[in-house]
Regions:
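Transmembrane alpha-helices and their membrane-interface boundaries in multi-pass membrane transporters
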Residues: 2, 416-430, 453-472, 479-527, ...
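Transmembrane helices with small-residue packing motifs
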Residues: 10, 17-56, 75, 112-121, ...
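Surface-exposed amphipathic alpha-helical segments in non-transmembrane regions
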Residues: 13, 18-20, 25, 29, ...
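Hydrophobic transmembrane alpha-helices and their membrane-interface caps
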Residues: 22-29, 34, 44, 336, ...
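Membrane-helix entry/capping segments
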Residues: 306-311, 317-364, 396, 404, ...
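Helix-loop junctions and hydrophobic alpha-helical segments within the transmembrane domains
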Residues: 340, 347, 351, 427, ...
Length: 885
């Protein structure tokens, strides 16, 4: 075959050009990512039961939905969280390789089957099922530097004017919004209601009956008698829009006196919920030279963008940034946006490092080849063949559905040393024929290929036999190794083809016949010294081999010793799924004592922000701090006593020393938290090493209660387990957000007395919900979108439980009676949230390995602690990255 192409070098060159062009075109259009798409498909189910405790959510919502979902096709495991805010969130992880769209459909079908068994309040709100991705590739915030706009306006401005364009970008999967939708807030005055004889049910019924979407029809619509000349569609104000219209809702009409909603309530457009408080600060670019100052923005709203599985991360985020830049030109005055997290910066930096290594490897190959072949013509041939082989590999990426990522590029770097061997073997064989047999370049190429054609093919098959079996490994590890292994295998295969087609043709065209006693220049005289040294080494090495050939037993024993040593060292090496890396930012999770208010959480987050922005050695490395109060990063739920900070650092090229690394910053925050806010739990964490596997790095474990124990007993088991785990030096931190000591009030209703007085329990429940919680009555339309109408008591009436006597209901005789007559109060405690794993109550455990220990060591330490402390009826399982490891 080689002789055919040697005689037709143009044909060989054309084939090489085609391979190169296919590779170049493929490379331009291939998706670019940090890692291959390895996170398994995930589906999220969520709903809200306003005013419900975690235990009520667990009993009436979580158990109902999860009992239906158990056994859905391709489900790996599921976890859920029932929070004290009334929110329920279920995350389902499916087996790798399953169809995400079918997973979503199958889950939705199971949820629909459970819908009829859910409380009516939950049915009214609805249960949403969405395809989920945990990879927050890009986070930006909207800010009002001078405080012109509040956080509710900022969030809804982003939703109404930015989200449609951003969600339409190719590659964008979903957007998580840190903020609340608009709502028509009806702030009731219970004292006025009591005086005027108005109940909570009266208010909600009036709103439902008078805020309705009405379609009145058309005057003159067919069929008619034919005498009608025009049709007149009837316009009617059914659904209300403004605060004034809601204020004019008639609550009561008696004795010619009309009582309106505005007489007993304050009405305004506010937020549907006030659980999130977002703030953003960033380094002031206008600060005097040598000073580090931060511009603080209050308020703020955040938006986190997740990508689709097959998205080109660089292209997608670049298009999102273009939209933000374009839309910002029409922002109202005193509104601006800032990037918080851009994970593509890490992707770019990683790929740039690999590219530098790639070209450094090519340069080293060039030098080594020239030193040994000592001819620029001979050196040029492998340097032409290598890029053809590597670029051709990109063409195979399209067929194999690979992306350009750090693993495939790393494989290409290693492949340089393999693919250049084929070209060197051919060139050396041709040089031998030229030098020792005096053949012409064309004859030498033909003669050489007769000798090396078999070895070139054999090398390709041997390397393929080594790497291709790795591609058949299962699970997430198999996906990682698959792209790495097949990249090398494909590049070696293309290299063998190039060595049989292009390289001998180039040898016939470019090499010159060998000339005896050719005049040597300075470079060749120096190379001759290298040759003499190499010959002396070769002679010595030959003598050593000759001696060893007579001592075969010594050779075998030496080989066995090295093999045994390798096995021993491998056994003691720490294990890890993937190493933790400096992603350019880190997360700080804050958990206040159970029951703490949002204001207290915001205060702690402000202290941490001030520490980052004012402490020498730390503020020099911090670019931006974005905080969100009301979100429990570790538990994955909404909670007034929890919050999270995103601390964004300067670029890597500006942080060279070890004390400027993420790990150094994390350690400093741990120390500050323990010293300055000991009453709160402050945990600083790296983001997950593999996007999509959890919210943070480190390990994730679930202690599963299959014994049916109460939450209090379960908490005791978890604390005993963590106490044992902390004694192991492999554990740096181990924590859980589960507790049962959240202060609460137990309301006991005297049902017998209520029945005797003709008071309906549902009226009492409605009054309590509307007073201390809130009731989402129905909807109104604004800015072309539908928002909720929410009824709730004014804040001064909700600050303590002694105002119960202000709440009145109507008995069967039409008389107003205070619900305080039927309720007794008692202080107690309750879980702040309840976690479930595979339809069983569980405790989520998180943490990280100590310095000098790998994640595998930490996992083994947790296994040992579980074996010592968990009683019968308790088991454990793993989540996120730990499950794959």
């Amino acid at each position: 075959m080689s002789k055919f192409f040697i005689n037709r070098p143009i044909f060989a060159i054309v084939i090489a050009i085609m391979i190169t062009l296919i590779g170049l075109l493929s490379m331009v259009n291939l998706p670019v990512a940090r890692y291959p798409q390895i996170s398994p498909p995930s589906v999220r189910v969520s709903t809200m039961y306003t005013g419900a405790t975690p235990q009520v959510l667990n009993d009436t919502v979580a158990s109902v939905i999860e009992s239906q979902i158990v056994g859905v096709q391709d489900l790996d495991y599921m976890t859920s969280d029932s929070a004290s805010t009334g929110t329920y969130s279920l995350s389902l992880q499916f087996n790798q390789g399953s169809d995400p769209d079918m997973d979503t459909v199958n889950t939705q079908n199971r949820v629909q089957a459970a819908l009829a068994q859910l409380p009516s309040e939950v049915q009214q709100v609805g249960v949403t099922t969405t395809k989920s991705s945990g990879d927050m590739a890009y986070i930006f915030s909207l800010n009002s530097p001078n405080g012109t706009f509040d956080s509710t306006f900022l969030k809804n401005y982003g939703t109404n004017y930015l989200m449609d364009a951003i969600k339409g970008v190719k590659g964008v999967g979903s957007v998580q919004e840190f903020g609340s939708d608009y709502a028509m807030r009806i702030w009731l005055d219970p004292s006025k209601m009591q005086k005027l004889g108005i109940t909570m049910s009266d208010v909600t019924s009036a709103i439902k009956s008078q805020n309705v979407q009405a379609a009145a029809g058309t005057v003159g619509k067919n069929p008619t008698n034919g005498e009608q000349a025009f049709q007149y569609p009837i316009k009617i104000d059914g659904r209300l829009v403004t605060e004034q219209q809601f204020g004019n809702i008639v609550i009561k009409n008696s004795n010619g006196t009309v009582l309106h909603l505005k007489d007993i309530a304050r009405i305004d457009v506010g937020a549907k919920g006030y659980d999130f408080v977002a703030k953003s600060s960033y380094r002031d670019p206008n600060a005097p030279s040598g000073e580090i100052l931060f511009v603080e923005h209050r308020p703020s709203a955040g938006f986190a963008i997740s990508l689709q599985n097959d998205a080109n991360a660089l292209e997608t985020i670049s298009n999102v940034q273009k939209i933000l830049q374009e839309q910002s030109k029409s922002f109202p005055q005193d509104l601006e946006y800032h990037e918080v997290v851009d994970n593509t910066k890490f992707v770019r930096a990683s790929i740039n490092e690999v590219e530098h290594t790639f070209f450094e490897a090519l340069l080293l190959v060039l030098i080594v080849v020239y030193v040994f072949l000592q001819s620029w013509r001979s050196t040029l041939i492998p340097m032409i063949a290598v890029p053809v082989s590597l670029l051709g590999t990109f063409g195979a990426f399209v067929l194999l559905d690979f992306s350009i990522n750090t693993l495939t590029l790393f494989a290409m770097v290693l492949a340089i040393g393999l693919v250049v061997d084929d070209a060197i073997v051919v060139v050396e064989a041709v040089e031998y024929e030229l030098k020792y047999n005096g053949l012409s370049p064309k004859e030498a190429a033909i003669a050489a290929m007769k000798n090396v054609q078999g070895p070139v093919v054999g090398i390709a098959f041997v390397l393929a036999a080594v790497f291709i079996p790795v591609a058949f490994m299962g699970g997430m590890t198999g996906i990682l190794y698959k792209q790495f292994a097949l990249t090398i295998a494909v590049s070696v295969a293309i290299s063998a083809v190039v060595a049989l087609i292009l390289t001998p043709s180039l040898c016939a065209l470019m090499l010159k016949p060998h000339v005896q006693n050719e005049r040597e220049d300075f470079v060749h005289r120096q190379l001759n010294k290298f040759n003499r040294g190499l010959e002396r080494f070769s002679d010595w090495y030959g003598k050593v081999l000759a001696r060893l050939s007579h001592r075969l037993s010594l050779t075998v024993i030496t080989l066995l010793v090295f093999a045994a040593g390798t096995g021993i060292v491998f056994h003691f090496l720490p294990t890890s799924f993937v190493p933790a890396e400096d992603s350019g930012y880190f997360l700080i999770a804050v958990n206040e004592p159970p029951g703490a208010t949002s204001a207290r959480t915001v205060e702690t987050l402000d202290k941490i922000k001030d520490f980052l922005e004012q402490t020498p050695g730390i503020k020099d490395n911090v670019e931006q701090v974005f905080t969100v109060s009301g979100f429990d990063l570790l538990g994955g739920s909404q909670k007034s006593s929890a919050g999270v900070s995103f601390a964004v650092l300067k670029d890597w090229d500006q942080r060279k020393s070890s004390n400027q690394s993420v790990n150094a910053m994390v350690g400093a925050v741990f120390g500050f938290g323990a010293k300055s806010v000991p009453e709160a739990s402050v945990v600083a964490l790296n983001p997950p090493s593999i996007p999509g596997l959890g919210n943070t790095g480190g390990f994730t474990m679930y202690i599963i209660n299959k014994a049916g124990d109460s939450a209090e007993v379960m908490a005791e088991r978890a604390q005993a387990f963590m106490a044992e785990a902390r004694t192991n030096p492999a554990i740096q931190t181990v924590y859980t957000t589960f507790n049962t000591s959240t202060p609460s009030l137990q309301f006991e209703i005297n049902r017998d007395k209520a029945a005797q007085d003709g008071v309906q329990l549902t009226d009492i429940f409605t009054a309590l919900q509307g007073f201390y919680g809130s009731i989402q009555v129905n909807d109104y339309t604004s800015y072309g979108k539908n928002y909720k109408v929410v009824v709730q008591a004014e804040d001064q009436f909700r600050q303590n439980a002694d105002n119960l006597n202000m709440l009145a209901v109507r008995n069967s005789k039409g008389q107003m009676v205070s619900i305080a007559n039927y309720i007794t109060k008692d202080k107690t405690s309750t879980p702040s949230s309840i976690t479930r794993f595979d339809n069983a109550m569980a405790v989520k455990i998180g943490g990280s390995a100590a310095q000098g220990y790998a994640s595998g060591d930490a996992i083994q330490a947790l296994k040992d602690a579980a074996a010592k402390t968990l009683p019968a009826g308790y088991t454990y399982d793993w989540g996120d990255q730990s499950r794959e490891e």
